[in-house]
Amino acid sequence: MLPWTLLDTAQIPGGADKLRLMCRGSEFSIMLDDIELMNSRVGGSEAALARLSCGRISARGGARILIGGLGMGFTLRAALALLGEKAQLVVAELVPQVVAWARGPLAGVFGASLADPRVSIEETDVGRLIRSARSTYGAILLDVDNGPEGLTRAENDQLYDLRGLSSARAALRPGGVLAVWSSSPDRNFTQRLSRAGLSVEEFRVRANGSRGARHVVWIATRPE
């Protein structure tokens, strides 16, 4: 078996932690310490995040979508496949080097998705875009950290607490969808979504299609 090779590191803004981009043959991994955050061969649940949310609004021709976290682009590519040519997709990525990796060593993984005219990349905290928006987005897709309880960056808690969820609700258009990915279930988070005035469904999805660990996707809808 081929050994893993370190390609690059990236400082997480506002903290001491560093991401590591690793390569083994044609396989890529982004690591935080000894935790694998994402792998180029395992993206089924991230794609499901887009499928379960964008599938509900795909009939709305000019939908504006906000994706929190670029990762390896599984969610972005799945959303592009579902949405029409008039859709607009804004991807917020906190770590500039992750965007550079997507255009560099991970270009083969991303394909043509970053060059799609529907896509714009914002190198910023997705929470800032959410808090500044009012009835703007048809869907907000969050794949930040490992979910509400898998925090690798303390500031991310502001996305998942009641105040953050209320901000997300305000940023959605009536009938819009907040979709949240998590590596594990969280009953308290489900209850917080409801308290924020959202109608909630919870789905268990496989990490890689029909195989792998079971992850969670919440679909929370703002009433019309």
Regions found by a protein language model. Give the residues of each.
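N-terminal auxiliary segments of SAM/dcSAM-dependent transferases
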Residues: M1-M31
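Short N-terminal helix-initiation segments at or just after the protein's N-terminus
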Residues: A10-P13, L32, D161-A168
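Short, basic/glycine-rich phosphate-binding loops at helix/coil junctions
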Residues: S26-D33, D143-P148
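Short amphipathic beta-strand/extended segments with alternating polar/hydrophobic composition
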Residues: E36-G43
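The AdoMet/dcAdoMet-binding core of the Class I SAM-like
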Residues: G43, A47-L172, V180-S183, Q191, ...
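Glycine-centered, phosphate/nucleic-acid-interacting loop/turn motifs that mediate DNA/RNA or nucleotide
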Residues: G176
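C-terminal lobe and adjacent flexible extensions of AdoMet/dcAdoMet transferase-like proteins
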Residues: W218-E224
